[in-house]
Amino acid sequence: MLMKRKKSGFTLIELVMVIVILGILAITAIPKFVDLSVEAKKAAAQGGLGAMRSAVAISYAQSVTTGTTQFPSSITTSLFADSQIPKNALNNSTSVASTSSIPSGTATSTAGWWYISASGRVGAYSDGTVDTSSW
C-alpha cells in the first residue's frame, strides 16, 4: 500500500493573513511609540530645567552668605559643575536668553532657555507644540 506523502509548509493564504495581522499590530503600536518619544523629550527638558533652577538657587545662596542677596546677572557655564549649560531637549539649544517677562508656554526661540535676572526665574522655550507654562 502506498502512503501519501504529507506536504509541509504554509499556504499563500496563511502567509497573507499573518502579514495582515502584523500590519494591523504595527498600525496600532506606532502611534504609542511616537507619543513616548514626545514624553521623553518633555522629561529631558524638565530635567534640564531643574538643573538650571538649581544652579540659580545655589548662586543666590552663595551671594546671601557674602551679604549681597542677588540673583546672577546671567546664566553662564561657570554656574555648573561640569561647566556646561544643559541642553533643552525640545529645541536642542543650550543658549539662554535674558528677558524681563515670562514668555508664553508655547513660545519658540533659537535659545533653549529664558532667564529673568531680577527674580531668578528660569524657563524652557518650547518647540512650538509643547506647553511649558506649567513647568
Task: Locate the predicted segments by residue.
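N-terminal leader/signal peptides at the extreme start of proteins
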Residues: M1-F10
